[in-house]
């Protein structure tokens, strides 16, 4: 028992004593943990602590968030792609923490300082006092301190002058692909364009815009992509690719042509004409005649055209392909057309050093002292008078010369001259060895060489027995007597004149023959002759079996003439061509036919011009294109498949059908029973009894219409040009109107009105007495002769339906254009219905019923 008590006492002492083993072990572990915590506190950065912070003397804690502790610029930078900044950025204050930085270079904390102070003590930090911050602010910062690394997409607004974000470092500030910067825009863009407006390809703006434009769309304002601006613009207009400017521009060095393809300028320019940056110099500059590499500034990117007057532009340069200049130039001695000027028209007197060395296209005018003119690179055309151009060089493909030359003994057209028109007397050494295109005039020399593809010769030749046209001559026009050995074996294009010899070989694709032939029995046109113009009497065996293009003249006994393979055109008189076959796509026939009952135009004849009397069986069933002439008894003419055009007089075409997309009809029709039901394009002439159906997309009607009560243009009529008169409607017309209106379809076009419910494009003409017209919804534009009426009363309180319930101009969908006379002041328009295009004279929007409604109510029609 005592032993048990002893064991218990030892156990209690060991367990609960002051120096017990568990207590010592716990104290030792606690001491080790305290030492570990102290060492960890000495090593770990402040950012490793949580938000609990440090315990102060008063028992409170100084709480700092992770954002305050994570400005360790290796781990706490901006991580989510700043997309867009819109607004104004000012200079940051001194005690502002930069949020977007990469690292701080040039600052090394001392070893004696706290790790926290060493990590965050930089200019603008919260851990520095005022004196340290002001002293550190003066230190320069590196380029890496001013960078966005996450692709800012767009900046729109005004940026001030910042000491923190310097101007020279702005390119580094937005480093990766800023998409667009657009300058200062006015808060409300209404009225005339401001000077600093930079848009995106403005297309069109015509007229004056109202000052107050809120929530409305009158005709004068085009919201997106205006096409054109016509009028007077402020000086500092800088756009992107302006297409056209018409008007007067004053002298201002800041707004004229930018460097992006100015197309057209028409007007008057004074002495301060600027082509590029710093182009105009107010002092005299001397320049050598041949110094092409001068420092003159000009149109750097292809100005197309200039029309006007230039007086003192000695240094004017069209260095890059100006197309055309029209006007007067007096003292442009140094005018440089060094890169492909296209055309010059006017008077030049003192241009001794005028340089057209690089492909000028055309010059028209008078030259007296241009001895050193260089046309060495493809001048196209010269028209005028030259007297002393001994050194004139057209060595590289001149296209055309028209005028008089007397002393041009050394004139060289050795490299592809295209055309020469005039008189030459002493051009013994004239060489057309390389593809001359055309010569018009008189030649007496025998040594002219046309061996290499001459295109055309027009004139008289007497002793040219050895002329060789063996290589693709294009055209010869004139008289030949002894040209027995002329070889046209290789694709001659055209011959015009008189020939008596029967040995001419046209076996290889002659294109055209114009003249008189008598005994050419063996003339072979077996391979694609294009055209014959003249008189033939005994050409019974002429073979046009292989795609002849055109025959013009008189034929009497050509019974076996075969046009079976795509003849293009025949012009002349035919009497007994009963077997003439146009079975395969003849294009055109012009002349008189009397007894051709079997004439077959079954396969796409294109055109017939002449008089036909008894062509009852004429078949135009397969896409005839055009018929021009007089028809009297053609009741069976079938235009069932897309006839394009008819020009002439028709009297009894009761069964005339243009049911499938006829394109055009020009002439007079008296009794036209069925209509042009499918997409007729154009009608020009006089119509009286209008049962014609334009139900499917008629394009155009030009002429006078009298009783068009049933005229229908329900689907996309494009244009009407003419005069329409209106008188009071009678009772029959009103009853008929009610029958039409009861169907509730906007497709009725009556005597005084044009209804085009779907995409009416244009109306040109005069419309009178249309006081009864009223607008419906969705009209985009209302402009008319209001006569100072209060248009603003037109509001949502007026119960105008969206379908047709009245007579008038109903244009509900996408009306494009109106051309005519419009009166009234358009500035006072205050509509709410997206007005498209409404025209009337006069017009009123009042709540009382219209004239037509009163007339309909008088007859019991509601």
From Swiss-Prot:
Pro-peptide positions on chain: 21-79, 90-149, 160-175, 250-259, 270-300, 311-319, 330-338, 349-357, 368-376, 387-395, 406-414, 425-433, 444-451, 462-470, 481-489, 500-507, 518-526, 537-545, 556-564, 575-583, 594-602, 613-621, 632-640, 651-659, 670-677, 688-695, 706-714, 724-757, 768-812, 823-862
Location relative to the cell: Secreted
Keyword match Iron-sulfur: no
Disulfide feature: none
Biased composition (Basic and acidic residues): 43-53, 424-434, 441-452, 459-471, 478-490, 497-508, 515-527, 553-565, 572-584, 610-622
Stated role: PRQFV-amide may act as a modulator within the feeding system as well as in other systems of Aplysia.
Keywords: Amidation, Neuropeptide, Secreted, Signal
Expression sites by tissue: Expressed abundantly in the abdominal ganglion, much less in the pedal and cerebral ganglia, and rarely in the buccal and pleural ganglia.
Region (Disordered): 32-68, 424-528, 549-634
GO BP terms in the entry: neuropeptide signaling pathway
Signal sequence range: 1-20
GO cellular component, one term: extracellular region
Name of protein: Protein PRQFV-amide
Highest taxon listed in the record's lineage: Eukaryota
Modified residues (Valine amide): 86, 156, 182, 190, 198, 206, 214, 222, 230, 238, 246, 266, 307, 326, 345, 364, 383, 402, 421, 440, 458, 477, 496, 514, 533, 552, 571, 590, 609, 628, 647, 666, 684, 702, 721, 764, 819
Ranges that cross the membrane: none
């Amino acid at each position: 028992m005592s032993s048990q008590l002893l064991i218990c006492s030892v156990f209690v002492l060991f367990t609960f004593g002051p120096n017990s083993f568990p207590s010592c072990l716990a104290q030792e572990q606690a001491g080790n943990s305290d030492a570990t915590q102290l060492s960890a506190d000495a090593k770990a950065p402040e950012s490793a602590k949580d938000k609990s912070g440090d315990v102060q003397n008063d028992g409170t804690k100084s709480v700092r968030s992770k954002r305050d502790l994570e400005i360790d610029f290796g781990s706490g930078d901006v991580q989510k792609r700043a997309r867009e900044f819109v607004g104004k950025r000012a200079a940051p204050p001194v005690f502002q923490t930069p949020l977007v930085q990469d690292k701080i270079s040039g600052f090394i904390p001392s070893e004696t300082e706290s790790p926290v102070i060493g990590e965050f003590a930089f200019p603008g930090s919260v851990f520095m006092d005022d004196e340290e911050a002001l002293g550190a602010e003066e230190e320069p910062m590196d380029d890496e301190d001013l960078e966005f690394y996450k692709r800012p997409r767009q900046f729109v607004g005004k940026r001030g002058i910042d000491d923190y974000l310097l101007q020279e470092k702005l390119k580094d500030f937005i480093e990766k692909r800023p998409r667009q910067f657009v300058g200062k825009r006015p808060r409300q863009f209404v009225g005339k364009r401001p000077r600093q407006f930079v848009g995106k390809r403005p297309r069109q703006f015509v007229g004056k815009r109202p000052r107050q434009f809120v929530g409305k769309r009158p005709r004068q304002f085009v919201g997106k992509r205006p096409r054109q601006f016509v009028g007077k613009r402020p000086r500092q207009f800088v756009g992107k690719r302006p297409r056209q400017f018409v008007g007067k521009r004053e002298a201002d060095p800041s707004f004229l042509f930018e460097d992006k393809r100015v197309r057209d300028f028409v007007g008057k320019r004074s002495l301060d004409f600027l082509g590029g940056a710093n182009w105009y110099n107010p002092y005299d500059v001397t320049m050598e005649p041949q110094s092409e590499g001068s420092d003159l500034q000009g149109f750097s990117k292809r100005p197309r055209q200039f029309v006007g007057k230039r007086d003192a532009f000695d240094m004017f340069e069209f260095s890059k392909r100006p197309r055309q200049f029209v006007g007067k130039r007096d003292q442009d001695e140094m005018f440089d057309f060094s890169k492909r000027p296209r055309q010059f028209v006017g008077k030049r007197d003192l241009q001794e050093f005028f340089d057209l060395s690089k492909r000028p296209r055309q010059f028209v005018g008078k030259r007296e002292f241009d001895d050193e003119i260089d046309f060495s690179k493809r001048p196209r055309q010269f028209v005028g008078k030259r007297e002393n151009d001994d050194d004139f060089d057209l060595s590289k493909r001149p296209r055309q010369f028209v005028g008089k030359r007397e002393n041009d003994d050394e004139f060289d057209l050795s490299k592809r001259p295209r055309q020469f028109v005039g008189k030459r007397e002493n051009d013994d050494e004239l060489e057309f060895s390389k593809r001359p295109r055309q010569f018009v005039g008189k030649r007496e020399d025998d040594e002219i060489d046309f061996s290499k593809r001459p295109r055309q010769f027009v004139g008289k030749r007497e002793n040219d027995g050895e002329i060789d046209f063996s290589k693709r001559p294009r055209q010869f026009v004139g008289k030949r007597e002894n040209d027995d050995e002329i070889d046209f074996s290789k694709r001659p294009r055209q011959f015009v004149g008189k020939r008596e010899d029967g040995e001419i070989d046209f076996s290889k694709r002659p294109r055209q023959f114009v003249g008189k032939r008598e005994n050419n029995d063996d003339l072979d046109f077996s391979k694609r002759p294009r055209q014959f113009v003249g008189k033939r009497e005994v050409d019974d065996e002429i073979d046009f079996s292989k795609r002849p293009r055109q025959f013009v003249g008189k034929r009497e006994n050509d019974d076996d003439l075969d046009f079976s393979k795509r003849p293009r055109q025949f012009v002349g008189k035919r009497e007994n061509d009963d077997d003439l076959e146009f079975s395969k796509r003849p294009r055109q026939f012009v002349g008189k036919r009397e007894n051709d009952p079997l004439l077959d135009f079954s396969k796409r004849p294109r055109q017939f011009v002449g008089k036909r009397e008894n062509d009852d069986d004429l078949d135009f069933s397969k896409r005839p294109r055009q018929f021009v002439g007089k028809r009297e008894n053609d009741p069976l003419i079938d235009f069932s498949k897309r006839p394009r055009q008819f020009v002439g007089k028709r009297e009894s075409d009761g069964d005339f059908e243009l049911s499938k997309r006829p394109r055009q009809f020009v002439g007079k029709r008296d009794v036209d029973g069925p209509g042009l039901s499918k997409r007729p394009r154009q009608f020009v002439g006089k119509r009286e009894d209008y049962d014609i159906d334009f139900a499917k997309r008629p394009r155009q009607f030009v002429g006078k219409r009298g009783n068009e009560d049933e005229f229908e243009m329900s689907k996309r009529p494009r244009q009407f040009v003419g005069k329409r008169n209106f008188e009071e409607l009678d009772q029959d017309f009103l009853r008929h109107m009610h029958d039409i209106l009861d169907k509730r379809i906007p497709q009725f076009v009556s005597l005084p009105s044009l209804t085009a419910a779907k995409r009416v494009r244009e109306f040109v003409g005069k419309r009178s007495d249309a006081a009864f017209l009223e607008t419906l919804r969705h009209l985009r534009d209302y402009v008319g002769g209001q006569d100072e009426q209060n248009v603003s009363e037109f509001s949502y309180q007026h119960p105008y339906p969206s379908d047709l319930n009245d007579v008038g101009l109903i244009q509900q969908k996408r009306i494009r254009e109106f051309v005519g006379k419009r009166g009234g002041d358009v500035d006072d328009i205050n509509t709410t219905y997206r007005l498209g295009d409404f025209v009337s004279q006069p017009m009123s929007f009042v709540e009382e019923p219209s004239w037509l409604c009163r007339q309909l109510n008088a007859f019991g029609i509601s």
